[in-house]
């Protein structure tokens, strides 16, 4: 059977995985990176998700640098399996949960990409004074360029705000709803302005969930 391994490199992604991943019967990791591999019976296009180089300052001290997560699927993608000795930290990879490989209930490709985008947007989270515009602009992109409904956008932005320790997270709860009703919708240019990067950089991140500039 074909397997999909969701390889988590940035620990921030684990917080979103706990929220949205649902049931997974096969999880492994190692002491320096526990619960970093989720495995299902499935087939997906393999992809590595990395922050573009002009955002490197946000992950300067991360153990895996710009790499956030990776979808490993197919025989060409090598995964260190439980029982193996990890070459970098000289520690054994071990199962943390193993009850066989289950099929994912729902759209696995969508949820893995959603987790990865949320991870990036949380790592890049705006400083105080710019957070409301940042969240409003994220909502604008998702309203205009995805098929997500208001409830999903509302939850996505609220959870990013919560995990980013935004003390006004409650005020971000209805961003999808309000963005859809707004006469003027902010989008990628506003996010790029806040983060002081190019619009194409932001477009790259949102392309992970199928949104294009």
Task: Identify the function of each model-found stretch.
Residues 1-14, 18, 40-164, 191-212:
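DNA replication initiation modules
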Residues 20-24:
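Short secondary-structure junctions
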Residues 25-33:
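Short beta-strand
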Residues 27, 69, 128, 169-172, ...:
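Short alpha-helical segments used as structural interaction elements across diverse proteins
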Residues 31, 187, 201:
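Residue-level signal for threonine
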Residues 32-40:
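Beta-rich nucleic-acid/ligand-interaction surfaces
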Residues 163-191:
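Charged/polar, low-hydrophobicity segments characteristic of intrinsically disordered regions
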């Amino acid at each position: 059977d074909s397997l999909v391994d969701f390889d988590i490199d940035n620990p921030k992604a684990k917080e979103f995985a706990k929220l949205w991943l649902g049931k997974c019967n096969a999880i492994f990791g190692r002491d320096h990176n526990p619960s970093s591999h989720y495995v299902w019976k499935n087939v997906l296009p393999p992809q590595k998700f990395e922050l573009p180089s002009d955002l490197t300052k946000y992950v300067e001290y991360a153990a895996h640098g710009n790499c956030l997560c990776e979808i490993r699927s197919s025989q060409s993608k090598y995964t260190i399996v439980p029982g193996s000795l990890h070459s970098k930290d000289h520690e054994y990879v071990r199962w943390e949960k193993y009850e066989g490989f289950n099929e994912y209930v729902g759209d696995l490709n969508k949820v893995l990409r959603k987790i990865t985008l949320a991870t990036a947007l949380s790592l890049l989270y705006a400083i105080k004074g710019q957070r409301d515009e940042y969240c409003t602009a994220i909502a604008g992109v998702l309203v205009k360029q995805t098929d997500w409904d208001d409830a999903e956008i509302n939850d996505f932005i609220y959870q990013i705000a919560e995990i980013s320790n935004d003390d006004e997270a409650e005020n971000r709860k209805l961003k999808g709803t309000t963005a859809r009703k707004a006469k003027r919708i902010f989008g990628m240019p506003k996010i790029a302005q806040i983060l002081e990067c190019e619009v194409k950089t932001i477009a790259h991140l949102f392309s992970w969930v199928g949104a294009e500039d």
